[in-house]
UniProtKB/Swiss-Prot annotation:
Phenotype of the disrupted gene, per the record: Delayed senescence. Reduced expression of genes involved in the degradation of starch and the accumulation of mono- and disaccharides (e.g. AMY1, SFP1 and SWEET15) as well as of genes implicated in chloroplast protein degradation and in the catabolism of lysine, phytol and free fatty acids (e.g. CV, LKR/SDH and PES1).
Region ranges (Disordered): 168-195, 259-278
Chief localization: nucleus
Entry superkingdom: Eukaryota
Domain note: The NAC domain includes a DNA-binding domain and a dimerization domain.
Coiled coil: none
Cross-referenced InterPro entries: NAC-dom, NAC_dom_sf
Pfam families: NAM
Biased composition (Polar residues): 266-277
GO MF, one example: sequence-specific DNA binding
Species this chain originates from: Arabidopsis thaliana
UniProt protein name: NAC domain-containing protein 72
Keyword Nucleus part of the UniProt annotation: yes
Compartments where located: Nucleus
Length: 297
């Protein structure tokens, strides 16, 4: 299977994470109806191909868009020139219908039919069943414009390969290499973009962010946190007046406690089972005052 030189996603200039997952109704109304009416698509994601001239495993490389499922507009080949039965012979095998047809409606009106088919390798009726599946969408009679015989000439097909549980474990070296390259490329790109975003943040120089790391509230409640480690911290600088920004009272509470200490109104209990500790923080880079936290055992 040939390798495409250019990435269709890059050429379409789509935002990261964008995927093409249309509903059955959208495929019929927004794409097939417009195709048979001669509408020009500004964003071409479904290509034209004579699907029955190829084996299904050759189709992904011919698609304009898609990763695990691929979409095509295909002429509807008939078995007999004046008949209505379609010709299902394709490449080295044939497509065989499975299940029952599904009527697709839009606003309560029947607009088309969805048919499921499975590809068999070899000649009918003794072909070997494969995991290649096709959903064929076609318009029904009253969806066609009067006097237009070309509306039945096109069908829209979705092609994909069904993966069984046993085959998920059996990955060929080529597939593994391709998946690893895709995963690493995506991860590297995402990591690079994250670094760019983080580098764009302003540097916050505030000593109050140098508090020792507390893994959980349980560490504090169990009395295992070393409050003595806070003694080595430099005093928190006084905040400059903020221009019209709201104050949440956290820093004021810290200053009030500091004033009480200077006046001798704060009594320290050294040998009690209870522990009260207050500390404040501020982030002047964002203009937000800190908060006062109190933990009791």
């Amino acid at each position: 299977m040939g390798v495409r030189e250019k990435d269709p996603l890059a050429q379409l200039s789509l935002p990261p994470g964008f995927r093409f997952y249309p509903t059955d109704e959208e495929l019929l109304v927004q794409y097939l109806c417009r195709k048979v009416a001669g509408y020009h698509f500004s964003l071409q994601v479904i290509g034209d191909i004579d699907l029955y001239k190829f084996d299904p495993w050759d189709l992904p490389s011919k698609a304009l868009f898609g990763e695990k499922e691929w979409y095509f507009f295909s002429p509807r080949d008939r078995k007999y020139p004046n008949g209505s039965r379609p010709n299902r012979v394709a490449g080295s095998g044939y497509w065989k219908a499975t299940g029952t047809d599904k009527i697709i409606t839009a606003d309560g009106r029947r607009v088309g039919i969805k048919k499921a088919l499975v590809f068999y390798a070899g000649k009918a009726p003794k072909g070997t069943k494969t995991n290649w599946i096709m959903h064929e969408y076609r318009l029904i009679e009253h969806s066609r414009s009067h006097g237009s015989s070309k509306l039945d000439d096109w069908v829209l097909c979705r092609i994909y390969k069904k993966t069984s549980g046993s085959q998920r474990q059996a990955v060929t070296p080529v597939q593994a290499c391709r998946e690893e390259h895709s995963t690493n490329g995506s991860s590297s790109s995402s990591s690079s973009q994250l670094d760019d975003v983080l580098d764009s943040f302003p540097e916050i120089k505030d000593q109050s962010f140098n508090l020792p790391r507390m893994n959980s509230l349980r560490t504090i409640l169990n009395g295992n946190f070393d409050w003595a480690s806070l003694a080595g911290l430099n005093p928190i600088p006084e905040l400059a007046p903020t221009n019209g920004l709201p104050s949440y009272g956290g820093y004021d509470a810290f200053r009030a406690a500091e004033g009480e200490a200077e006046s001798g109104h704060v009594n320290r209990q050294q040998n009690s089972s209870g522990l009260t500790q207050s500390f404040g923080y501020s982030s002047s880079g964002f203009g937000v005052s800190g908060q006062t936290f109190e933990f009791r055992q």
